[in-house]
Amino acid sequence: MSNRITVGLDGSGADTAAADWAAHEAELRGAALELVHAEDWAQYGPFTVPLPEPREQWAEELLSRTRDRLLREHGTLDISTHGTKGLAASKVLASSAADADLLVLGSRGLGAIAGFIVGSTGSATIPETDTPVVLVRSLDGQDSPPRHAGDAGPVVLGVDLRSNCDRLLAFACEEADRRACPLVVVHGWSLPPVFSYAPVLDPGVEKEMADGLETTLSELLRPWEKKYPRLALDARIVLGQPAIQILDAASGAALVVVGRRIRRPALGARIGPITHAVMHHATSPVAVVAHD
């Protein structure tokens, strides 16, 4: 990795939130910050139509204006800019972030009930890159995110005990340790479908299954507790839909961390339903970490 954070800009109101969060995170990490803007050329059959000159000038001004503002507020940061045109924005962002530690994108709020829009570029970029992607919220048209990278609140991690969680745990533990805040690890689970046919469920069965999951989670976390002895770990095994349990735990979180399986299926990479729900409904910044 290059000790660099890349943030994608598209000129929307969510840009300010994403750039501010990325700048705070870069200060926490002692990392450089790269501002990236990509313009797609219009497609007409096999031909592409270059952008008009005013649009190119606007893109250059967007990058320079954002850089100048961040330097006024974070004078010690090393900030670079990169603009490109003619390629799909998701491809450009994924390529720019290939050797970065983090890619930061904005998402726009629709209100407390509707949730957030993760734009088409963001949705296309996340499956394209193995770099962790953080989605930063802009609420109700406001430019500022609800939480900056250094704000109080725990880091909340959603895990699936059936998957390899090492990369998620490494990312979440490091983020919580960097912020000197607790790490809440949540695993939501449901009873196997066969139990739905039982007229009366033996309460001992549910307890036995929950105890087994708690043991599994404790064993999973043990090496990380040794690696981060100062980290306050709160492990939770909760009966219920995983996305709902993660969102409940994420209220007031500094950062929410969820996973995305690294897959290359014939129909293309995708984002799983739990991560998709958290991306669209968590009010805190959401980190999507690719894992095996």
Regions found by a protein language model. Name each.
Residues P52-L62, P203-L213:
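A short acidic, glycine-rich active-site loop
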Residues Q43, D143, P193, Q245, ...:
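Generic structural signal for helix capping and beta-alpha/helix-loop junctions
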Residues M1-P52, D151-P203, E225, A232, ...:
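Small/aliphatic-rich secondary-structure junction motif
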Residues M1, A14, L71-L103, L110, ...:
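Structural beta-alpha unit
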Residues A19, H24-L28, S95-P145, A250-D292:
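Gly/Ser-rich helix-loop-strand patches that form or flank binding pockets
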Residues D10, R67, R108, D160, ...:
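Short glycine-/small-residue-rich Rossmann-like dinucleotide-binding loops
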Residues E34-V36, S80-T84, V134, V184-V186, ...:
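General small-molecule cofactor/ligand-binding pocket signal
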Residues L63, R67, S218-R222:
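A conserved short alpha-helical segment within the catalytic HATPase_c
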